[in-house]
Each structure stands twice: as structure tokens, then as C-alpha cells.
Amino acid sequence: MRNHIIFFSGGKSSFSVADYVKTNYPNDNILLYFTDTLWEDEDLYRFIFEASDKLELPMLIHSRGITPAQLMVQQRFMANNRVGTCSKELKMKVSSQYLKKGIVPEVEKWHNKHYLKDSNFVSDATLYFGIGFEEMHREGPIRANWKPFKIEMPLIENIIDNNAVLAKHNIRQPRMYDMQFAHNNCKGRCVKAGQGHFKNLLMKDEKTFIELMEQEIVISEYIRYCKQPAIKSGKQPDYMYKDVWEFVSTGKKSNKILNILEGSNYLKSKWRNLGVDNKGQPIKKPYTFMKTLSLEDLEKQPIQCDIWDIGGCGCFVEYEED
């Protein structure tokens, strides 16, 4: 009996891969493996639990116990569409340390564990990814990152209709696809996304867009604040951390947070001194998820953007072990 581990993202492609493995290796030890950023759409959880139930496969859920926004505050770094630290820390590092070193993260949950046929499911396991031919640029890095494991990507080598697989099991697709998102990640808040993606978020889920926009403003100002010599050296206490952490965790807006949000136009004005960066160079503009445009700017002029700039996480590509 062989071991098969499916990286189960909550998307249609990874579900098709799970069905493929179950169909071709019904008597083997198969595991659905989900790394949770705690930032996902509520309907994603409905989908992964229903998938586990109908496929009759065990699902292991691992998490660091923090969201991408909380990670940015901890690291004092704005994850963005050039550097996806949230994907690296909350997904890639979690899974790599567990499967290669046996390190269990802060949060571990099981669903349908009784379907697990052997508790030793990691040894000589084949790892499966829901990567299709349109994402073949991810194939090489994933294979390199996961040596010495054997890697399989059935959607590259086989013609599989995701919607037909959903119909086969009578499972409704995640609602993010109904909202015309290209993937079902992070409730449309993926920081590696582009203008077209965030424009769609603004039109389809304005509440989530506004929450993310405000987090971008506050985290940017907090990072700038932390780069000041007195704070960075520890000579002066960090008077903002508690308020910023509570804001990104619960949405509560203290007076400090309200001052940042209400003064956002001044905070990014050309005549304001934003401080210096790690190299001692002047910080010329606020930190943003996208390179050239803040979400606040996008909200004000949503039509004047590149609608074809979709972007996305590309998990398990940019990762080197510590």
C-alpha cells in the first residue's frame, strides 16, 4: 500500500486531482492536506469538508494560527505582488517543515481521520499538486522544492474537466468562482493579485475590499513608524503594535488607528517626510500590495486600471528552506 498526499487548496483543480488519485488508487493510503491561512472565504471550508466527506478521504489541516495581515505586523513587512511572504510562511514553510522534518505547526486539525488507512502516511509518499498546463511555469520550482519526494501533477498529463468532476460528486463549486475570481484563495485578498483582481473584489465584495484597503493603509504606516531609528534600535517603546495588532485581528479601531485612516491623504502626500528605509534612503511613498497603485487609489478610480492584470499567489514556487 502506497502513500499519496494531495495538496488540497480548496480550489476546483485540487479537487479534481483528489478524485483522480482516489479513482486510480482506491486501495492506497490517501490524504488531503490543507494549509489554512485563516483568511479564506467561508464557503471554502464548506467545499473542502464536503469534498472530504464525499470522496471518503481523511483531511489534515495545518495552520500557524495567524492570518497574513497578522504576519505582516509581526514581521513589520508588507507582503506584496513581488514578495509573497504570507504564502511562504503560512503555507510553504508549514508544509515543508511538517513533511520533511516532522514539525507540527501551532494548529493541527483532522476531518474524517477514520478514513486514514495507515498513520505513517508520509514515508515514501507521492505528493500531488493541482497544477494545469496553463501554470506549467510552476512545475519546475515545485519539483525542485520538494525533493526527494516524488511529485505528480495529473492535470498537466491528463485532460480533466473540473466541472465534470464536481458534477460527478454533486458538489457545488466554491462561490469565489461564481464571483468570477480566477482562484479560491484568501477570500479575494491575495496580496500577489493585480489591478483587475482587486477591481473585481471591489465590485463583488465591497466590504472585504474596504477592510483590506484599511489594513493596507494601517500596516504601511506601522512599517514606516517601525523604521525610525529610535523604534528600530529599541531605545523607544513600540507604542503602536498593540493597536495595530488588535485592528488586523478584530477590526477594532482605536483612536490611533482612526487617526491613521482619517489622515491617509496626508500620510501619502508628497511633502510629508515618510522616514528612511533599511538602507537609510528616504521612503518616497507608502507601502502597498501592488507596485504602482494602492487599494485606496484603485477605489477612487476603479475603471482606470488594467483589468487583465489578475495575478495570484503561485504557492510553492518561491521557497528556500531555512
Regions found by a protein language model. Name each.
Residues 1-322:
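Nucleotide-activated chemistry modules centered on ATP-dependent adenylation/adenylyltransferase
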